[in-house]
């Protein structure tokens, strides 16, 4: 499969999509999955049971607890999405809900038949798999987890994203929130998702070697400023979910 680079705009820092994939809902997450993801995200942010990095590896912006909650909630929802999709055909572990100290929380993976899967999330209108450049070596291994080798990396897109809801309710930059009151914002939301595709470790090594990079300070689609430098793969270039085999 060919990989396409982002197109440079009139401004050198403006980058535009060249290979997109329309959002196509696969399913709606069961409420019990949503509640588990919510509880985990709350404890890792407002609850302070664990610790999430307040900034990206190559970034400088320090996130507030409300932002950490929203980002963590989205990520865990998307892990449950992959779990619900793949459990139909594979023996797969449930998403990890343990709260760890700093540096351990993002060492999450699914394991199927000895193969490790990494899950990345984005909003429903997203078209990029983003991997922070400082976190990966030239072998496509994840440096913060002792150079862990992921065999597959999936991208999941979710509608009604937590960040959008938190922003609308003016809670995104909050320092503290009551758990029961916060849950009321999310319990009746329909959490539907799609999976635009996945890449293999060999694909990742190719992307790294050929410098598929969007830099800190670049503007995605000319408007979204990148806070960190990332390797990327466009959604339209990813292998479709139906091609996943072990």
Kindly label every feature range from the protein language model.
Residues 1-108, 120-246:
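Nucleic-acid endonuclease domains
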Residues 110-114:
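Active-site beta-strand termini and strand-to-loop segments that position acidic
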Residues 116-118:
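Short hydrophobic-acidic sequence motifs that mark active-site Asp/Glu residues
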